Amino acid sequence: NSFLNFFPTTAVILDVDADHLDFFKDLSDVEHSFREFAELVPQGGLVVANGDDANTVETLRGVDYVSFGFREENRVHWANASEDFRTFDVICDGKPYCHVSLGVRGRHNAMNALAAAAVAWLYGVEAAPVERALHAFTGAGRRLEYKGRYNGADIYDDYAHHPRELHALLETVKTMGYRRVLCAFQPHTYTRTKALFSDFVQELRGVDVA
């Protein structure tokens, strides 16, 4: 709940899910905290949220927010996306806003870029600097971070410690053209592993060796 100590004028909610269950009681408890966070935004501020995520939509029921996502029902959505999600157009209120060409792969990175573009559009930023900034983003450490090559295999490090993050990671790897994928998974916290064990197992079944 440390984010409830902030004083946001703009709140961006990428998704809401059951996590940190050593602190939160359950998903409803998580949703309650995210709603409190959104309600910290003062009048005249902005709440920008993932309209594709059912938990987020439920959390913000009755809250005024701008939705972004891949579906056309969102005020900000994409079009003409490439197979690896690195390039796409951003459509805002039905009109083309900018063309995104990312230096990182993955549906989750595309969603994050959509969120950033949505905020920029709402604040009246022109398309060109948005395109430049998103193209220059090279990713965060331990997020599909290339570590080198060993015995002919490319080695990557990723901090994916939740089933949804693991799903996003492995879906991204599938777009990279590898013949075989091996995943060495280190569980992070006993509480999370116990609560989400079956979901972790389901995701790890998607690779050749885990």
Report each predicted region and the residues it spans.
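Switch II (G3) loop of P-loop NTPases
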Residues: N1, I155-H161
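Acidic, Mg2+-coordinating active-site environments of NTP-dependent enzymes
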Residues: L4-I155, Y178-R179
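Active-site beta-alpha connecting loops in nucleotide-dependent enzymes
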Residues: A140-R142, Y159, R164-V209
